[in-house]
Each structure stands twice: as structure tokens, then as C-alpha cells.
Amino acid sequence: MQDIRLTTILNRYGKAHQRIKLVEEIGEMLAEVGRYIADGERRTNKANVVSELADVVIVIRQLYPDASKVERKVPEGEEVARLLCEKAASLAAMVAGAPFSKLELSYAESVLAFIDLFVRDLAEVPMLEMAIEQKIDRQIGRILRSEGADGNRR
């Protein structure tokens, strides 16, 4: 069952806007993961990486409520990061182009799976879960503040 907060956010901004937002968030995630890889996996501030991963997870969950983390054979360290970047870049290219397709859903599931593997490699699963919750709550707060008591936009 999809989190009602995600549905609220999607309804507020619309699918077309959130598809563009996904491309943007994937770009930011790719930059952070790229820095992590270039740093030889010694990046001291994992919070930046996890924050960008959370943004991607949130928008994927909005656009693809039926997406689940598909089981993946567990590759090693840098390989997970590389595969995550590859799948995310492919998803961004699809989202920026043609309308929704089943292949797009498959890539969304792969991205979620590789995010899960990557955050486990970072040993930061709780940080990701907390970041997702905080970011969703913050967005809902913005929506509520922008609407009057009658539910209309201000």
C-alpha cells in the first residue's frame, strides 16, 4: 500500500512535474555517488550521499507505487555504486523521453534495489530511512502551509 503522503505530493505537483523532478534528483545523486567513487570510497560525509539517495527513492515511490526492490545478486563495493549509476542514468534518460513504459518500471525497480545494496555497503540503512521520512514530512508541511484551512492553494 502506498504511503498517502506520497500520493498527496504527487497530486499536488502532478506526474509531469515529478518526472522532471526525478531526472533532476537522479542527476544530483549521480554527482554525489560519483564523488564517493572518485574518493576511493573514503568519503567522510556519507550524509550527502544518503540524502541524494533518499530524494531519488521518494520520487520513484511517487511515480511507481508498484515498484519493489527486485532481488539482485550482490556485487562488491564499487561495483554496486557503478551499477546504481548505470541504472539510474538509464531511468533518467527514459523518463526524460517517452511516456511511461513497462521497461521504465523495471529500471525504477533496479534503481531501488541498487540503492538498497549501496546503502547497506555504506552501513547507513537507518540514516536513509530517517532521511526519507524527514524529507516526506517536510514536503507535506510545505503543502499544508501553502494551502488554507479550506484546502485551496494560497
Give the residues covered by each predicted segment:
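Flexible "arm" and connector segments at domain edges
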Residues: 1-154
